[in-house]
């Protein structure tokens, strides 16, 4: 199964806590401002791009324990985010609008990832090709807001209400099939799907995140 998640829309509290989701790091004097406790000044300095690329530090997603499930009913546990965030680097690319079928058409790469334990979130360092991602680069230089969304493959998900494990939505239990994100009074909880084994393969700039 493929899951899509947009932090600004799906986890509004994450945006409130962070203040800013995306930061362009173009010069040496931007490094301190763009760093965090997870994506440190040293990490940014070690990953400065060549002249043909630009670098962005962004927040990809937050842990479910702190920020809840998203509007699709997907819950991303802290333990899974800690364990699998590096798949953004090993399997992922920087795309536009989730056109992620062909890595050759990617706008760039994910250079580094980190789990910020203090802030309960995954942070990424991406390099964009200044020609392929010219639009994104120009907007970032102008200080315009850029929205990002991620995609992940999961071998299954688990209903938090009854524990049913499904490899496809056709095998969902009654809670996820008809009551996703709804309160289930007999269990005194909201129904959502736990994704505890994600492979993150796509971080995309999206124009209309709410679509």
List where the protein language model places each region.
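Signature of dsDNA virion morphogenesis modules
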Residues: 1-211
